[in-house]
Structure formats: structure tokens, C-alpha cells
Amino acid sequence: MASTSRDVIAGRGIHSKVKSAKLLEVLNAMEEEESNNNREEIFIAPPDNAAGEFTDEDSGDEDSQRGAHLPGSVLHASVLCEDSGTGEDNDDLELQPAKKRQKAVVKPQRIWTKRDIRPDFGSWTASDPHIEDLKSQELSPVGLFELFFDEGTINFIVNETNRYAWQKNVNLSLTAQELKCVLGILILSGYISYPRRRMFWETSPDSHHHLVADAIRRDRFELIFSYLHFADNNELDASDRFAKVRPLIIRMNCNFQKHAPLEEFYSFGESMCEYFGHRGSKQLHRGKPVRLGYKIWCGTTSRGYLVWFEPSQGTLFTKPDRSLDLGGSMVIKFVDALQERGFLPYHIFFDKVFTSVKLMSILRKKGVKATGTVREYRTERCPLKDPKELKKMKRGSFDYKVDESEEIIVCRWHDSSVVNICSNAVGIEPVRLTSRHSGAAKTRTQVHQPSLVKLYQEKVGGVGRMDQNIAKYKVKIRGMKWYSSFIGYVIDAALNNAWQLHRICCQDAQVDLLAFRRYIACVYLESNADTTSQGRRSRRLETESRFDMIGHWIIHQDKRTRCALCHSQTNTRCEKCQKGVHAKCFREYHIR
């Protein structure tokens, strides 16, 4: 536009210049310079009296090119004038590159048919030689617990704790025997607890515990517990919120999987480790027995043996699979850990937090069976009966559909409420009758139950059983560090696993969980006790130390005693066991 018209039409953009002005001003500016080559577009706003009853809109010739013919109301109307040409002022403007448009992922449309599922998985035929080997060893409770807190793990904790104390200019000199004593006190605190842990060492008759006081001094325990460490601070991963306990998690997962019973059915879910401090990874779960603490993803057997665990860090620190949410990605990690022992037709059960049709499809491709309750918006538009309609039908009614391409079934069942359940391995048939309490009739009635619902209810509770066992006698002693409660959780999980193996391997002489924990705590504390001024040692400690293959030496004794094995007179004894034993009987006496 000409310079005069530019004075009237100010304001510029990247591609055009727009300003509101009076029509008469614009026409006068255009008449002053006829040499303007830019194309002008003028938009005239309606006059002020456009809504009035009388207008002078017909007062001139419409074909005239001059503005004099226009009525006054139009000449004084506001206009928008746009210059579509290029001007000098556009040279300094930076053009923004166009954003790349992401291609939308087109999901395949599933075809749902009302029929029962036809799974193509093989049957379970695997045996477990490792459990048979454990049965033949007849391990004691301490031996079973030390399958997880083995010599390598104990020495690792000792080395890291001494390293951390040395970095703080403290000569701790922790030994493996002292660490086991500390573990014994932590285990004992699960079934004998005081408001203050120092009361274990008080001389007051109402609180003194001689087993703890004789095993280790109070200040020594406090010093060891305050410097307990599990990683080198100079090699921590900044992207891992649990970097200070990550080496322990890796070791425990390895031991848990190594000695896990090889079974067909597994359960996956969430567990909570109680914690009330200030930590970013702490979570709140309303309606849970443990509402506040660290959330831990857990994979267990149907009986409650913990096979694999991973503390939750959220999507910021844990990148989920692109096609799944965080929960589904954790299920895949658990399945990958299971398949390290072999690609077998495992059957995984989980609840609606994890289940989706997409997850069922991925697990099917991995050769893994899965069943779980599912939220309606994750069924990929499976055309089932409306829940309101199903509620009007009698209890036990159900509707179901199967995906034709991947043999995935979605069933909606009316029990006390309407529940959706999905599976890639179990179908509707056979439909069984189950007993339910009827509030209206005040009696129990028989309702129909599909096969996949029955199997789900029987096998899904593994994580809940583990939580129940841990909560009964969990470690009560806590420290100032944020991971002290997590360490207590790991110890409790190892005790639960050891007890589960005890129930499998020692079916003739089983003990309950409390007696199992007491046995381990007493052995660890008695083995570190100062026995110089005490009488004979307990029968329990003698049995454990006799077969540990550590520190047994044959020495001469002045007074002849009877051999503990052949019962004849001997002048030699075992230095550790303090039992008379012949040289020829020494080896046989110390082997089970």
C-alpha cells in the first residue's frame, strides 16, 4: 500500500496488516496515491442505524466507483482494511517452523462373537527337582532363611556397612556374626516389642530381656544399626529413587527366584511398606490396611511365596511400555523374570488395576495364560449387556463375548454387584453352582458361576496371603534413615518365603509362622551370646552350630569324657561344640 494509506492502516502481522478505521479516511488516502500496486480488501461494518426502521442505503448508484455516492452512515462506518502484499516490515520477522504432526496409531477393530473361548495353550507338565533336593536336605528354619540371606549377601552388607562407616571416619569393624545378631534382634522385635528399643537392655525386671542383653551391648547395636548400608554412595544412580537399596533388591530377587517353587499359578498385585516420613516415593492408598508408605509391585505364587518385587517409583522414573500403562508394564517385567526359568505355560492372575485386552494379547504372544478383572473402558468396546440391565436379572446371570482374532474372552457376571473379568486361557464352561448369602431371603442360595470366575477367586489371593503373613509379626524397630522400614519389609518377606518352603519340605514336622521366627531369632542371638559365666548352652543352638561347618577343631582335653557319637572314653573334644569326640568320629559327628 502507499505510504499515506499505511499511516491510516497501521498494525502488522506475519502475512497481513489489519486495522480498524473509518471508510471515508481510507478512501481519501487511496485517492492521494494512484500508483499503489498492492491489492486492497476493505470490509465494511454495518452502520450504526442498520437495525433501525429507516435507512438511506438506496441513495446512490451501486455501480459507481467513487465514494461520494455512499450515504453518510456508511462513510462513517468502521472498516477493516487488509493488505495481502509483502512489505518492508516483514523482513525482520522470524518464521516459526511448522510442528510435526504425529501420526495417529490406528488400533485394529476387534470382532466380538458370543461363543466360548478355544485356548491353544499346552497343559502344565513341569516338575520341580529343586524342591525335591531341598526336601532331601531336611534344612532347619535357619538353613531355609539362609537360602535368601546367604553368605554372599551377609558379606556384601558387612562390606558396604564398614565402607560407609569408614567414609564417616568411624572404625566399625562389623563382622558377619554381629550382623546376624542384629538380624536376630530385628526378627525378635516382630513378636516382642517395647515402646523404646533400649528397654531390651534395661536392668528393670519388667523390661530386661537377657537373650538380647547377653548377645550384644546396647551401644554396639545402636552403632551398627545407624551405619547399616547397602550401596556405595559414590556409585549411586541419580535416576533411581531406591538406589541406596538397589543392590540388595537385585540380590534378594535373584535368591527368591532361584529357590521359588515351580508352579503353574501365580498372582500379581500391589503391596505396601509402611512409612510415615518425608519421601517423594511415599504414596497414599485409601481403603488399604497400610494406607501410607512405599508401594511395591509383587509377583507371588498362589500360596504367598514372593517370587519377584520392585518398589514403585511412578512414570517419572519408570518408563512404561508404549502400548501399556505402568501397571501392565510391571506385569510384563514379572513374566520376563518367570521365563528365565523356562518358557512354560504359566498362568498369571491380577486385578483391574493391571488388566486390559491389550495386556492379554501381549501375554498370549509370550505363551503365558492370564486372567483378571477388568474396567469397562479397557474392554475395547466389547458389546456386553449394560450393567443396569444385568442388575435387573437374577443373581448369577452373565454375558460374554470372544475376540475372534486372538481368543480373548470378556465376561460380565452379576454377583452382589456386576463384575467384568477377562481371560486368554479360561472360558465359561463348565458353569458351576456356588453358594451365596441372600439378604432378602436371609439364607444361602445357589447361583451360577462361570469357570473363569471360579478359578480367579481361588488363585488370585497370593499377594494378600503374603501381606497377611508379613503383617502378623513384622519388624518393629525403625531407624532414622528412610530405607529402614524397607529393610524390615525385605527381612519379613525372606522369613515368609522360608516358612513357605518349610511347609512344602517338612510336611511331617511343620511349625507355625510364630514358632518359625522364634527359632531363627533365638539361634542368632544365642550364637553371639557371652557364655563364659553361663551354664550349658541350649539344645537349639547345639543342633544348629553342630552342622554349620564353621570353626570346628579337634583339641586335646586333660579329663577323659565320653564321645558324643560312640559314647566310649576319649581325651579329645571339639573346640566349638565343647563335646568329647574321637578323631575317627569327628567327621561323622559334624555331618547330618
Swiss-Prot record:
Residues 31-69 are annotated as: Disordered. It comes from the Eukaryota. One of its GO terms (molecular function) is sequence-specific DNA binding. This is PiggyBac transposable element-derived protein 2. It comes from Homo sapiens.
